[in-house]
Amino acid sequence: MQKSADTVRVNVQLIKAASDSHLWSDTFDRKLTDILSVETEVAKTIADQLRAKLTGDEQQVIAAKPTSNPQAYDSYLRGLAYMLKTAFTPENSLGAQKYVKEAVRLDPNFALGWALLSYVDASGYLTQSLQPTAALREEAREAAETALRLQPNLGEALLATGFYHYACLKDYDTALKYLEQAQRVLPQSSRVLQGLAFVERRRGNWDKSEAYFQQAEKVDPRNVNLLSQHARSYVCLRRFPEALAKLEQILNITPDDIDTLVLKARIAQAEGDLPRAAALLAPLRLGVGYVNALETQVYQAILESRPGPVIAELKEILAKPDQTLGFYVGELRFWLAWAQEVAGDHSAARESWSQARTELESFLKEQPENVVLIGDLALTNMALGDNTAAMTLAERAIAMMSVEKDALTGPRPLDILARVAARTGDPDRAISTLEKLLSIPYEAPLAANPPLTPALLRLDPMFEPLRRDPRFQKLANPQP
């Protein structure tokens, strides 16, 4: 798109994604005040080029003008662009939220904008890429309700409502009801299919989730967020070759994408290939918004027993912490303390853990259902020698989130429990929990989230107290 004074030129190309072959191109010139009409004209022209027969509903969707305010639509598109990135990071979710809030401020009747705001808030609540407070959950609900009130048959509003029930309430039956309604209005929407894949994944229906991901990718083969989520399913299932193949697809579309390279590194760690992980992580220069990526670099240094450089990096970041990260500041300080402990600086580690505990506890009152935060506190108390508090917190997390309710992240508290039990003198409980974890797919609580593997049991120093136990040795060195 090119802009000159009050005129805009839009250059459009139609490319067959499967073969990257050129099918059609054209140029559209419009006044800036009429820019929104281009979208309808382009959609109709593409349908003609593809000789697609549009249903009445589809013609109405194409003809609809989502807002009469070009600035609101511009903000909406900027927010949407953040949501189409590969990962739900604080940086991406905060960026999306900022622009979409501006869109609905500029046009309070912008139903599509309200629907996207609900989706941004709900996904941020679920993934903790936004601070998962009751206020955020309420904002997601109100935005979805506003979108439906403004346009009751808007597919994106139905999608947002379904996603709210899925992400904020874990009410999967109601979520499916709305997603299926959205699918009838938007039969070719990859976001609806992705939503269905998400719900089935949390239900533990991994094969059904896989089928929805495959359908979505046929519709939208260059959607890197979709491809990344599909890859993460493979990671949780420990199907690492398939995950890596999917990540290569992403890198062909967005070369050098940081979140994709970090996930490749975590797979290498999970497979016990630390040199390969190091080669992927070494070139990355990370801002503070890349929390998972930073933690993956620290984890690499811990696994290698070479934490010196990352200690200096974390100290610099935490000297002036970004308060928009919320509880992640305390989580990063936990990682600093762990690195200091591995480096042998026990007094500095204890000081950092004490500060981390204070920072994390300050968020617990307004985020009482944040299982990630509770897990962080359990590990921090464990490190400080408060075994009773550590175990109480781990068991609190387990009571809040079960594997039966959430097959994807429900096992996370068990991962925390295994670590706490290993370090607090309860090897029987640690090993029985590890046996269960190694037998199921899940998204782990630490760094970029691959589940525990035999290789990680061998490398992770948190399991050092179990090293001489024959039962642990059997888990860490399984026979082929």
Residue ranges of model-derived segments:
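Hydrophobic, well-ordered secondary-structure elements that form the walls
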Residues: A378, A418, A430, L466, ...
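Terminal, low-structured helical/coil segments at or just beyond the last alpha-helical repeat
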Residues: P451-P480
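Acidic-histidine catalytic/liganding microenvironments
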Residues: D107, Q151, I440, D460-F463, ...
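Acidic, Ser/Thr-rich low-complexity linear motifs
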Residues: I62-K65, L130-Q131, Q323-F327, S362-N370, ...
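Low-complexity, Gly/Pro
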Residues: K365, V372, R419, K474-P480
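Acidic, proline/glycine-rich low-complexity intrinsically disordered segments
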Residues: M1-Q340, D345-E369, I374-L377, D386-A389
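Sterile Alpha Motif
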Residues: R412-P445
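TPR/TPR-like (Sel1-like) alpha-helical repeat modules
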Residues: R285-G289, S354, E395-A399, I431-Y442
